[in-house]
C-alpha cells in the first residue's frame, strides 16, 4: 500500500531512481514505470564499497564515485547517498551539468534534522523520529552499529495511531532505562503512562514523565553520572 502511494508521484516519460525495495514493493514501482513509460534504476547495494561509518562523518564509494563523504549519521544514510548519486547520473543523462565537486560538496553539506541527529555531546544526545516498525528497525541497526558497548537512556514518545507495540519490541531492549513522554498539544499523542505500561513487559526499567522538560532533565542527570552513557 505504501509503495502504491509513493509510486503515485511518478510522472509519465521521466527517469525514476529508487533504493532497493522488498520484492512486492519493487514490483509495484516497476509496474508504475512500465505503465508510464519511465526509465527505472535501483540502487545496487553490491556496488557500495569502502564504507567507513561514523557519527560526525561517513564515507563510501559507489560505482564510479570514490570516497564520497556525508555528514549524516545512521547506517541507512549511505544507501540514501547512493540513491542521490543515482539521481545525479540520471540528471546528467538528461543533459544537466553537475560537476563532481558540486556533487561532493552537496552530499557533505546535506543536513536532515530528526534522522539520527546528534544534538548534544558529553553526554551524546541523539534525536530520531522513528515512528513505524521499518524506521525502528533502522534505528536499532544504527544504535547497535555505532554504540555496541554503550549504555543507552531513552526518552520515548509515540502517537497512538502508530504501531508502537512493534516499535517497542524492536528498540526497548537496547535501553538501560526508558522515560516515556506525551507529545504536548497533540490529540494523537499516546499518554506517557499508557506508553510506559506498554513498554514494561519488554523493558521493566521504564517510568513516565509529566513533561518533556522533566524527562530531559532527569535523563541528562543520569547520563552525566557515567562517562559512557548515550541517550
Predicted segment positions?
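C-terminal helical cap/extension that packs against the catalytic core
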Residues: 22-41, 56, 124-127, 133, ...
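Hydrophobic aliphatic residue packing
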Residues: 2, 9-10, 16-17, 125, ...
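Acidic, Mg2+-coordinating active-site environments of NTP-dependent enzymes
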Residues: 1-64, 85-104
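Nucleotide phosphate-binding/pyrophosphate-handling subdomain across enzymes
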Residues: 1, 64-177
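Beta-strand->loop->alpha-helix junctions that form or flank phosphate-binding loops
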Residues: 19-23, 34-54, 71-75, 102-109, ...
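Short, surface-exposed connector motifs at secondary-structure boundaries
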Residues: 7-16, 146-152, 174-177, 222-227
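A generic secondary-structure signal
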Residues: 5-8, 90, 142-146, 170, ...
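C-terminal lobe/tail of nucleotide-utilizing enzymes
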Residues: 23, 47-89, 213-230
Amino acid at each position: 500500500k505504501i509503495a502504491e502511494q509513493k509510486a503515485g508521484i511518478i510522472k509519465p516519460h521521466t527517469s525514476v531512481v529508487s533504493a532497493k525495495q522488498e520484492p512486492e514493493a519493487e514490483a509495484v514501482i516497476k509496474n508504475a514505470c512500465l505503465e508510464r513509460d519511465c526509465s527505472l534504476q535501483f540502487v545496487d547495494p553490491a556496488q557500495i564499497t569502502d564504507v567507513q561509518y561514523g557519527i560526525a562523518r561517513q564515507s563510501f564509494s559507489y560505482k564510479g564515485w570514490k570516497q564520497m563523504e556525508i555528514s549524516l549519521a545512521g547506517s541507512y544514510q549511505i544507501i540514501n547517498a547512493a540513491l542521490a548519486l543515482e539521481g545525479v547520473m540520471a540528471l546528467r543523462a538528461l543533459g544537466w551539468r553537475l560537476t563532481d565537486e558540486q556533487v561532493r560538496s552537496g552530499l557533505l553539506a546535506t543536513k536532515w534534522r530528526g534522522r539520527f541527529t546528534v544534538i548534544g555531546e558529553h553526554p551524546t544526545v541523539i534525536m530520531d523520529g522513528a515512528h513505524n516498525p521499518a524506521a525502528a528497525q533502522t534505528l536499532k541497526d544504527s544504535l547497535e552499529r555505532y554504540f555496541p558497548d554503550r549504555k543507552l537512556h531513552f526518552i520515548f514518545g509515540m502517537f497512538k495511531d502508530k504501531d508502537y507495540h512493534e516499535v517497542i519490541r524492536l528498540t526497548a531492549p537496547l535501553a538501560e532505562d526508558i522515560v516515556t513522554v506525551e507529545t504536548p498539544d497533540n490529540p494523537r499523542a499516546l499518554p506517557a503512562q499508557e506508553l510506559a505500561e506498554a513498554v514494561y513487559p519488554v523493558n521493566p526499567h521504564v517510568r513516565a514523565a509529566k513533561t518533556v522538560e522533566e524527562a530531559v532533565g532527569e535523563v541528562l542527570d543520569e547520563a552525566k553520572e557515567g562517562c559512557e552513557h548515550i541517550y
